[in-house]
Amino acid sequence: MKNFLCEDFLLSNETARRLYHEHAFHQPIYDYHCHLNPAEVTQNRQFDNLGQIWLEGDHYKWRGMRSAGIEERLITGDASDYDKYMAWAKTVPQTLGNPLYHWTHLELRRPFGITNTLFSPDTADQIWHQCNELLATPEFTARGIMQQMNVVMAGTTDDPIDSLEHHKAIAEDDTFNVKVLPSWRPDKAFKIELDLFADYMHKLGEVADIDIRRFDDLLSALDKRLAHFDSHGCRAADHGIEIVRYAPIPSEADLDALLARRLSGEVLSELECAQFSTAVQVWLGKRYAQLGWVMQLHIGAQRNNSTRMFQLLGADAGFDSIGDRPFAFELAHLLDEMDQTNELPRTILYCLNPRDNEMMATMIGNFQGGGIAGKVQFGSGWWFNDQKDGMQRQMEQLSQLGLLSQFVGMLTDSRSFLSYTRHEYFRRILCDMVGRWAENGEVPNDLSLLGPMVEDICFGNAKRYFEERA
């Protein structure tokens, strides 16, 4: 019987163990998509205590706490960090079977070095004091943790109107060797149905020094901001798409009219929203191709389901779930609009509903080519799927319907500096899967063949994919 979270955690066979310890473990982390606040890296934030660094902004943990009956005051309310931490300690023993239990103990092990101690109300005070002592040292600041975890690149998520002042400051700081690069998140520019759309057009126009009245004004403003992002090292865009919309792109005069009507406060039809969204996203995709950027499409979240809690806490507070709208037709046509002129950028497609895995794994095969290995990617198990079964499903389906060897691997998609252990979690699951294939005779049990593939999936593929500009 194995002990919990031993050195061979999740590694069920000898080949898996060798793949992980000899090939995966020491690979650097190329965290190409996250939601870290770059200001906290610039300022090298020193966290006051374990409760603060662990629970601040982590809606995964918040959902678990609510399900365990913890009152909101102890989750997002005005309770002290210690009281929130103790509420989390009360919750964790109830999360057995949920990845939260694994993540919690992995995060205590790395970087804090706490092993052979289960987190519970009985051990919480001891762990609180031990971790707080470490958090007061230079090795456990925001930058210190990134360096301890061997992070070489973190791609943040940034609005086109952002100044990127913090990314500039980090890039100019020779004392810090981790790249923190912006990623372009233009959702508010193509989701014309949003209540805040007109206000956002005003803000975008101000930053770009363009009065946005016509469709071409919008494209000019976006183009200025694209240049700004590119000059600050941006290599990726990310579109959050709850509903994939596609409609044939109308004339520029029609797009001008749609924009004018929306800016005046008129509500547009679903078809008109689809026409506008398609026009903007296709234009953006072609610009990404020209710039040598990667386009990421995160598809299928159903957001802000609780009106009451949205009004109380706002977005990204743990009230989102998996959507179930079909989107294969719309996605194929959206990508094809760019591909018809050979201007589809390197693209990563993520789906939140695992029902769509096989569809996505076959969709990427429609648009490969151009001499680029893995040009269009089926992204790693996202959000509700970044757990053992979800990540294994995604990789097995990719291997059966595409090329696992070209996969760009894991990303944290997280707001927490302690989430880098998710790369370890992913790597263990990857090595166990490949090791199992070898032990079953499904692939050659040859580490000279399997080892380099594992290394590439853990690091090399992502580095090449995001750093090549062609």
Curated annotation (Swiss-Prot):
Keyword Isomerase: yes
Listed pathway(s): Carbohydrate metabolism; pentose and glucuronate interconversion
Taxonomy, superkingdom: Bacteria
Keyword Isomerase: yes
InterPro entries: Metal_Hydrolase, Uronate_isomerase
Pfam families reported in the protein's UniProt record: UxaC (PF02614)
GO MF terms held by the record: glucuronate isomerase activity
UniProt keyword annotations, A-Z: Isomerase
Protein EC: 5.3.1.12
Gene Ontology biological process terms in this record: D-galacturonate catabolic process; D-glucuronate catabolic process
Catalysed conversion reaction: D-glucuronate = D-fructuronate; aldehydo-D-galacturonate = keto-D-tagaturonate
Family: Belongs to the metallo-dependent hydrolases superfamily. Uronate isomerase family.
Protein name, as recorded: Uronate isomerase
Gene coding for it: uxaC
